[in-house]
Amino acid sequence: MAKYLAQIIVMGVQVVGRAFARALRQEFAASRAAADARGRAGHRSAAASNLSGLSLQEAQQILNVSKLSPEEVQKNYEHLFKVNDKSVGGSFYLQSKVVRAKERLDEELKIQAQEDREKGQMPHT
């Protein structure tokens, strides 16, 4: 009886071990895929995301901007900043999120402008 019980325990541990190993491999693959996707976004953009604490997509969602145009960013920023003003019953937390999102988008616009200038200055060979 003890022999069968020991065999059942060993088999159970093996099954759980294999499942854990498979889950670990899947997690590593997903992590690698996410890292590759972030790598394609560009080093400057990733650095800006790290500094501001917001990704470009998050900032665009907060300010409800689909394309990066300075006019649309500024217009939406001003509207959301006024609406969330504490004196009119708004939320300081949301207002600060709006400010951080604008800073992140301004940084991205600056990066894009710099990359455009660098492309324009490169000699054509």
Curated annotation (Swiss-Prot):
Changing residue 92 to G: Partial loss of protein translocation into mitochondria in a heterologous system. Substantial loss of protein translocation into mitochondria in a heterologous system. Partial loss of DNAJC19-binding. Loss of DNAJC19-binding. Its main location: mitochondrion. Keywords: Disease variant, Dwarfism, Membrane, Mitochondrion, Mitochondrion inner membrane, Phosphoprotein, Protein transport, Translocation, Transport. It is found in: Mitochondrion inner membrane. Changing residue 93 to G: Partial loss of protein translocation into mitochondria in a heterologous system. Substantial loss of protein translocation into mitochondria in a heterologous system. Loss of DNAJC19-binding. Changing residue 94 to Q: Substantial loss of protein translocation into mitochondria in a heterologous system. Substantial loss of DNAJC19-binding. Partial loss of inhibition of DNAJC19 stimulation of HSPA9 ATPase activity. Changing residue 94 to A: No effect on protein translocation into mitochondria in a heterologous system. It is a peripheral membrane protein. InterPro entries: J_dom_sf, Tim16. It comes from the Eukaryota. The modification Phosphoserine is found at residue 69. Induction: By CSF2/GM-CSF. Ubiquitously expressed. One of its GO terms (biological process) is protein import into mitochondrial matrix. GO terms for cellular component: mitochondrial inner membrane; mitochondrial matrix; mitochondrion; PAM complex, Tim23 associated import motor; protein-containing complex; TIM23 mitochondrial import inner membrane translocase complex. Residues 58-110 are annotated as: J-like. Probable component of the PAM complex at least composed of a mitochondrial HSP70 protein, GRPEL1 or GRPEL2, TIMM44, TIMM16/PAM16 and TIMM14/DNAJC19. Interacts with DNAJC19. Directly interacts with DNAJC15; this interaction counteracts DNAJC15-dependent stimulation of HSPA9 ATPase activity. Associates with the TIM23 complex. Associates with the TIM23 complex. The J-like region, although related to the J domain does not have co-chaperone activity. It is linked to Spondylometaphyseal dysplasia, Megarbane-Dagher-Melike type: An autosomal recessive disease characterized by pre- and postnatal short stature, developmental delay, dysmorphic facial appearance, narrow chest, prominent abdomen, platyspondyly, and short limbs. Belongs to the TIM16/PAM16 family. Regulates ATP-dependent protein translocation into the mitochondrial matrix. Inhibits DNAJC19 stimulation of HSPA9/Mortalin ATPase activity. This is Mitochondrial import inner membrane translocase subunit TIM16. It comes from Homo sapiens (Human). The lineage of its organism: Eukaryota, Metazoa, Chordata, Craniata, Vertebrata.
